[in-house]
A protein has these predicted regions:
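N-terminal pre-Walker A segment at the start of P-loop NTPase domains
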Residues: 1-18
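Short phosphate-coordinating micro-motif centered on Lys-Gly-acidic
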Residues: 2-5, 50, 85-90, 96-152
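Phosphate-binding P-loop
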Residues: 21-28
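Short hydrophobic/aromatic beta-strand immediately N-terminal to the Walker A/P-loop
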Residues: 30-32
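P-loop (Walker A) phosphate-binding loop of NTP-binding proteins
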Residues: 34-36
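Conserved lysine of the Walker
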Residues: 41
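Short beta-strand-centered segment that lines the nucleotide-binding/catalytic pocket of NTP-utilizing
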Residues: 54-70
């Protein structure tokens, strides 16, 4: 599985990485983002949204579970499953409709829906380090590989 690693030292660098990913995000359906609390998952998503042209506030959908955005024909759904008690709750949320529709789903805390979510196109792990964050981006599909090429 193709993987790219990036050391990120600041919020601005994390947002810039997200903006680079946004250049090809329309080619994928599911991006999972993992990392501990405060790792920078929402910051990365904010960078993606800024890269797509969103100028407004970007909040983590911790309590609403999903925050939708639209950019012309591209629908972008930002999920935060931190407060998900049971993966079965995703059925009530209409997760299948989001995944089967014309859009990209970016999911923080995807591990909380293990066994319910399909395999992602891109899997991102953010780990705190002494000098910032290590971001590992792994692709699992040909569509994910296209996104990864935006970083090389």
């Amino acid at each position: 599985m193709p993987t790219v690693e990036r050391q990120v030292a600041s919020v601005a660098e994390m947002e810039a990485l997200g903006a680079k990913l946004a250049a090809q995000v329309g080619n994928v359906r599911l991006v999972n983002i993992h990392g501990p609390l405060g790792a920078g998952k929402t910051t990365l998503v904010r960078g993606m949204l800024r890269g797509l042209g969103h100028a407004g506030a970007v909040k983590s959908p911790t309590f609403t579970l999903v925050e939708p955005y639209s950019f012309g024909n591209l629908h972008f759904y930002h999920f935060d499953l931190y407060r998900l008690n049971d993966p079965g709750e995703l059925e009530f949320l209409g997760m299948r409709d989001y995944l089967d529709g014309n859009g990209v789903c970016v999911v923080e805390w995807a591990e909380r829906a293990q066994g319910v979510l399909p395999s992602p196109d891109v899997d991102i792990m953010i780990e705190p380090t002494e000098t910032g964050r290590m971001v590992r981006i792994m692709t699992l599909t040909p569509q994910g590989n296209v996104l990864l090429k935006a970083l090389t």
